[in-house]
Amino acid sequence: MEGLAVRLLRGSRLLRRNFPTCLSSWKIPPHVSKSSQSEALLNITNNGIHFAPLQTFTDEEMMIKSSVKKFAQEQIAPLVSTMDENSKMEKSVIQGLFQQGLMGIEVDPEYGGTGASFLSTVLVIEELAKVDASVAVFCEIQNTLINTLIRKHGTEEQKGTYLPQLTTEKVGSFCLSEAGAGSDSFALKTRADKEGDYYVLNGSKMWISSAEHAGLFLVMANVDPTIGYKGITSFLVDRDTPGLHIGKPENKLGLRASSTCPLTFENVKVPETNILGQIGHGYKYAIGSLNEGRIGIAAQMLGLAQGCFDYTIPYIKERIQFGKRLFDFQGLQHQVAHVATQLEAARLLTYNAARLLEAGKPFIKEASMAKYYASEIAGQTTSKCIEWMGGVGYTKDYPVEKYFRDAKIGTIYEGASNIQLNTIAKHIDAEY
């Protein structure tokens, strides 16, 4: 009878013969993927480059972060409850965003912008979201979608016309989603038919953020449905254009101060000069801007979760039950430590994606990771905070229930969580 060791050895040899080729020999150097992390590691190893911690900021970034924190606490915080209850953003808040230079963060000073970094935009959104996620997304859309698309793809005339307005007084709105085109956004049906020097738009849009206040709409419409998504083109449409109808704002669970409206286009004539970029490239522009926007949404969810956490911890340090603080119970301490660790992980994912974008490195996978994780953690954090505060956390007398309601949208808009997972998996497949 063969000994056990012999049988095991034979079994291991047989198993080894059926291993995937990537595991055929332990002597072969491990496969290095083409991910941005691997590239960064190789750069450090080969070139001796020193990288500062992700939470190291320039003096300008620190100044912006500090001033936005002060603005949010002093001018936005007192109005949050009223804006949420009335589903209306106060004009003073919108004016304050423009006056603070927060509606044109990356726009060149030549056009009235701040001329700051993309990470500055992320820090601004994070700080605003700590106080009100509605105000944060209002600022996020303007900066990461509207301004970015015009800066990158606009003609000199378009930039000269619209950027000075967008940095000082005019709100922009991004119009992609439709009733039958949500996650499958390129199934949109809005048409743009050429008539002389104009394009005539017909169709409808849904879930359009900031529509109630917008003076400029960046509209995706198809100039040739026979070629599918390759006919999608971007148009700049002014609010007062005849035939453009803005519907009643939706009555939403969260982000109630941020208007979300349906739009209808009935023979809306748009000059050919208002095409943004090239005809048929709208789908590329939309994908590119949404990839960047996902980092902005990650920052929004991160800030929201951190704001809720910051409000809750002082309460559980003061609340006495069974003769001691809630915070002194080890079971609760472990929950707090777990949530704090998740928040830090979400922050590092978000900042890393922003740094990669600024460095001109591939960032799409990292943006999806940041958006996915920050959104999921925001939901978990706000839920835990309500539990820790108990009954008072469940009432509208305290802001934690609003944080909880606001957090849910993170797993839905600018790419649902499952879409982010698809994107991440697609990149992993390509890397290996």
Swiss-Prot record:
Residues 1-33 form a transit peptide. It is an enzyme of class 1 (oxidoreductase). Keywords: Acetylation, FAD, Fatty acid metabolism, Flavoprotein, Lipid metabolism, Mitochondrion, Oxidoreductase, Phosphoprotein, Transit peptide. Its cofactor is FAD. The modification Phosphoserine is found at residue 183. The keyword Acetylation applies. Its EC number is 1.3.8.5. It comes from the Eukaryota. It is found in: Mitochondrion matrix. FAD binds at residues 174-183, 207-209, 319, 330, 387-391, 416-418. Belongs to the acyl-CoA dehydrogenase family. Homotetramer. Among the different mitochondrial acyl-CoA dehydrogenases, acts specifically on short and branched chain acyl-CoA derivatives such as (S)-2-methylbutyryl-CoA as well as short straight chain acyl-CoAs such as butyryl-CoA. Plays an important role in the metabolism of L-isoleucine by catalyzing the dehydrogenation of 2-methylbutyryl-CoA, one of the steps of the L-isoleucine catabolic pathway. This is Short/branched chain specific acyl-CoA dehydrogenase, mitochondrial. The lineage of its organism: Eukaryota, Metazoa, Chordata, Craniata, Vertebrata.
